[in-house]
Amino acid sequence: MRVLDLILALITAAVVGYTIALVSNSGCYVHFDGRSATTTCPPGPWVESIANGLYTAGLARPHPEPECERRQSSW
């Protein structure tokens, strides 16, 4: 997944009110638990800062770990 695609996906997910649990075809994903974001994509820190920024701005909602697992397995 290209960097721009991932950023746009994060923004789109936040704007339409979906929780953040994004998975690319490569199996890399971003999981946001309401306190911090984690990602399997290197480099992780910039992705985490975007997700944290969206949450701080009130544009993202937390979700439980199983939700991330369901989305990851369905993509």
From Swiss-Prot:
Cytoplasmic-facing ranges: 24-75
UniProt keyword list: Host endoplasmic reticulum, Host membrane, Membrane, Transmembrane, Transmembrane helix, Transport, Viral movement protein
GO biological process: transport of virus in host, cell to cell
Stated name of the protein: Movement protein TGBp3
Family of this protein: Belongs to the Tymovirales TGBp3 protein family.
Localisation per UniProt entry: Host endoplasmic reticulum membrane
Miscellaneous: TGBp1, TGBp2 and TGBp3 seem to act together for cell-to-cell propagation. TGBp1 is the main movement protein that physically cross the plasmodesma with the viral genome. TGBp2 and TGBp3 would facilitate TGBp1 function.
Lumenal topological domain: 1-2
Function: Plays a role in viral cell-to-cell propagation, by facilitating genome transport to neighboring plant cells through plasmosdesmata. May induce the formation of granular vesicles derived from the Endoplasmic reticulum, which align on actin filaments.
Transmembrane intervals: 3-23
Principal place of residence: host cell
Cellular component GO terms, alphabetical: host cell endoplasmic reticulum membrane; membrane
InterPro entries recorded: TGBp3
Keyword ATP-binding attributed: no
